[in-house]
Structures are given as C-alpha cells and as structure tokens.
C-alpha cells in the first residue's frame, strides 16, 4: 500500500464509505490506545481480531457489503481473550445463524472441499458418517459450480490407507463413504471414489477431476499448500454472504518486517469478486 497510488480513506461508520476504485476504506472497529508489539501472541490482538470479524459479519448481514475477505487470525490469541472458537469458519457460522457450512480451498492447480475442519484427528474420524459425506459431496458440487464448473467431476478421498483396501484397513469407506457416493450418483451428481488419498490429489491436478472431497483438515491442506500456497484461497460455503480468505496463517515470525507476500490475499479478493458475480447471475 505504501508504494501504491491507492488512497486510504479512514471512516467511523459504513455510511461514510465512498466505494470508489483506487480508494481503500478503513473502518475503525476497535480503538486500541496502545498497539501490541508485532509478532506476539496476546489477548488484546485476539479480542480485536474477533471484534473486527463480528463487525464484518454484521455489515454483510445488513447488506452493506457483498463479501468479506478476512485476514489470518491467531487462534491462540483468541483463546487468551476467552473467545472459544477454533477459527473463522465457526465464528462466521455462529454469528450468521448458519447451521451447515463447509471449507473449500482453491488455487490455480486444484479445488478441495473438507468434510471435517478444525478438530482433532480422532474427532474427525468420529464425525465421518453418511450424512456428513452426502453434505460434503453436495457442498463440493455447489462450490465448484459457483466457480464456473458447469458439471463438476467430484472425487472423494478415502479416510484410511489405500481407501480402506476393501475393509482390511478400516470400515468407514464401506459403512459411510461408498453408500453416500452411490446416493449422490443416484441424484445425478458426477462423483466417484473413495480414492486413495496418496494419489487422488495428483489425479485432480492433472485434470481428471474438478474437485476433491478430503476427509480431514491436513489431508486437504497439505496438497493445496504444496501445490500453490502463494495463490491459495479459503472459501466458506453455506453462508448467506460471500467469504474468502488467504490460505496462510499470521506468520508472526515476519510480522512488521515489510516482507510478506500479498499474492494469496490478492487471490482471495479476486475470488470473492468472482463469487459475487456468480451469485448475482442466479438472482
């Protein structure tokens, strides 16, 4: 921003915004008398970030803005401020009164939908059931369509090694994942699986599939970041408004040094604009 020709316009309320190209509206949500030091986990930053998110949700719910593009937050700072949410997704769902949401991650190489998000691996396994899988497949279908894929080809990753190997390495594929895939097929969705997670993401990267349903957080996050962290975008599906964010964390180790790469944030803004246009064409 310092080296650009953009104009910084500080406002006290949204009615003062002019929403003009070349102008960055900065709404003061939290008045911090003493700014915390850069790069340190603390409750002040946690509370301020939470209040900013709540303010953004209210603006979106009141139709003052068409989309929210959030910055990374530090979950430990939230906890220190006694804010008991594991991440953005849960905050957004709670304060927009949305029951079912999903996390979709995209970059220039691949699209991934997570069937479980911010929880322990043991908890994620417990959450895998027929309803969870059907919901994830439907979210993947709608998410891919919102990004311009007319007839999405959906691949569902297995939970266990080798996608369970016919029950030798686990029953979740047989009990839940395969029945959900078959049910989705019956409704007309182009979906297949379960596929071994050590190969399916590369198959999708080659263009064999449009989107992959991953069964737990790191199963989906590792390939998306490996294949393009610099242009990765996190999209929350199911909300009454568009929400995107860059696909990286707070990077406290370089905070205040002026060396952060804005590419992922740029991609998140571009993606939000695309989703807004897609949403408008359906009205």
Q: Can you annotate each of these PLM segments?
A:
Residues 1-88, 131-215, 219-225, 230-234, ...:
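Contiguous, glycine/small-aliphatic-enriched amphipathic segments in soluble metabolic enzymes
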Residues 20-24, 107-112:
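Beta-strand-turn-beta hairpins that frame and shape the catalytic cleft
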Residues 72-74, 112-120:
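Acidic/polar active-site rim loop that often engages polyanionic ligands
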Residues 91-94, 98-99, 121-143:
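Active-site glycine-rich loop that binds ribose-phosphate moieties when present
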Residues 120-125, 250-254:
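Intrinsically disordered or low-complexity boundary/linker segments at protein termini
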Residues 80-102:
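Glycine/threonine-rich beta-strand-loop-alpha-helix active-site module
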Residues 95-110, 237-253:
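Short, flexible loop segments at boundaries between secondary-structure elements
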